[in-house]
Structure formats: C-alpha cells, structure tokens
C-alpha cells in the first residue's frame, strides 16, 4: 500500500517515501509519503485558499463539521486501533480503549469550543474594552505521529 499526501482534498504523490514497519513482525505495512518544505508550502497555500470560506461559516456549522469528524473516528475505533497497534507496536487495549477514542474526544471537545468561546467586555471610566474571538489564519505543524 502506498499512502500519499492529501493536499486540497486530493492525493498528491511525493518525491520520496519511507516504509512503515510493524515492530512486532517486521512486516512492511505501507510506503508513506515523506514530506518536503515544498509539500508543506502547497498544503499551506491550499489551506489559505480555503480559509475565507471556513472562517465565514457560522461557529455552529464549524462545530457540527468537527463533531462529525469525531463521530467518524468513534465509529471506526476497532479498525483504527488495529492499524495503530500494527504501526506503533502499542497494545490493542491502549489504542482501542485510550488513544483512538481520545482522538474522537478531542474533536468533540474542540467542536464545543467553537461555540463556547465568548468575548468579554471590560468597561473603564472612559472607554469600552472588549475581546472578540474569530478565526485568524492558517498554520503548519510538523510533529511526531506516534499517537492518533
């Protein structure tokens, strides 16, 4: 199996791939795209292009979409847990009862944060100060992929 990047909703081939190996059996599970700075820049450009439409959606709709992602993960815990166990060597009880369900829970938590982050007013004798939260932009994060 070959796993490509997913940029702008489309699979994108990489210039290089690495093998992911089941640590228990040494079986090659897949060839995974190895990202470059150019790949990150393409993903950031796609995200920037999509950002105005995302930011323009009501917070309740953004929350619904994120909740749906959490539900999708939750419906597939057994399959995702098996894959994670094969990929990382962690026990199936850890991936199936903790790590993968936690990934679903994270989407549910941040979905709720979309609708619960309220601004505050801080009156002073001469001015009205307030906070206002809204989407501000795109960022890229490259981190170890050792848990879902």
Model-assigned labels for residue ranges:
Residues 120-148:
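Conserved small-residue-rich beta-alpha loop and adjacent elements
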Residues 9, 26, 62, 107, ...:
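Residue-level signature of catalytic and energy-coupling elements of molecular machines
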Residues 13-15, 102, 131-134:
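A generic fold-level signal
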Residues 9, 35, 89, 119, ...:
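Glycine-centered flexibility sites
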Residues 29-117:
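Glycine-rich loop-to-alpha-helix module at the N-terminal edge of alpha/beta enzyme cores
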Residues 5, 85, 115, 133-136:
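Short glycine- and Lys/Arg-enriched binding-loop motifs that mark or flank ligand-binding interfaces
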Residues 1-25:
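Hydrophobic face of amphipathic alpha-helices that form TPR/SEL1-like repeat modules
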